[in-house]
Amino acid sequence: METPLYAIRSLTHVYRGKPVLSIDRLELPRGGIIGVIGPNGSGKSTFLRLAGFVERPTAGELLFDGKPAAPFAPEVRNRVTLLPQEPFLMKRTVLNNVAYGLRIRKTNDHLAERVDKALSYVGLDAKDFAQRPSYALSGGEAQRVALAARLILKPEVLLLDEPTANVDAVSAQLIQDAALKAQRDWGTTLVIASHDWQWLYEVSDTVLHLFKGRFFGTGRENIVFGPWDLWENGSWGKKLADGQLLRASQPPTSDAAAVVADIRLLNGKTSSASGSTDCTLSGTITRLALEKASGEVRASILVAGVPLTIVLPQQQIREQALYPGRRVSLAYNWPSIRWA
């Protein structure tokens, strides 16, 4: 049995006396693409810093390739690299920024050629950018240079923290393409935290949900956030922006996150659910995307501003003529809702 790339056991991390991450057990395989989804403050950045061995967890076990490793230890420093959401560039030329990691490793062979190739990965021409000072770069260009500085190392693991959050659309596409090319060309394991959950669903082998410092689910669940209200009839639920009612079981707290795992499409059109505990919602298909892992189609549906997804066979998409912009009805069983 192959040793997982990461193995985490009973890990907790505390920041200024406040628990920010708690993982009972988690294993990440090598060579794949793992997406991490969660709202702001859920612990995504903390998780990536720990996985990047930038920080040491407060307690628990974090194994890399079957062995414990300390922050910045030699056994991980040359194999794992993290691109933070706001990466730091030195006040030097683009060439010196990209080449820095190789120089501190005393790997200076064919340096200019390797910098040129790394820049080409992120869509930058070395003739135009190599001698440009870092302060003369736009936000998107700076992010791409920072990524090139990681890619030149051909890392075994590349951790990306919201890599496209603060860049223009062109830079975002180039950053995404470069990361995926590294995975294809070198077998680099990608761990990506992003608000672009639709892109993550398309490219990831596994998608993990993180909420309030805890992992739950494997990507096929729908997560609906509070607040939740107690209605006059004694039921709990959430009134959506267009007046639709999303009924739920009693939440542990009014701001809890509901995990809705079994949402069904009702004949591809407006219709009624049959079960006594079924509830229906009406929404609009906004996107259809092929899932990398399953070969099925993930349909993104916007219900009064709440994004939901369901996974359907390609044949059903064709037979029911489903397409972006079409109105559909969904059904779910409200007593089966779990809480995070």
Role assignments for model-derived ranges:
Residues 52:
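Helix-to-loop junction immediately C-terminal to a conserved catalytic motif
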Residues 37-39:
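The feature captures the beta-strand-to-loop junction immediately N-terminal to the Walker
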Residues 67-81, 104:
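ABC ATPase NBD coupling module
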Residues 110-128:
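Conserved ABC ATPase "signature" region
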Residues 133-137, 141:
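Conserved ABC ATPase signature
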Residues 158-162:
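Catalytic Walker B motif of ABC-type/P-loop ATPase nucleotide-binding domains
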Residues 242-289, 318-340:
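Glycine/charge-rich catalytic "coupling/switch" loops of P-loop NTPases
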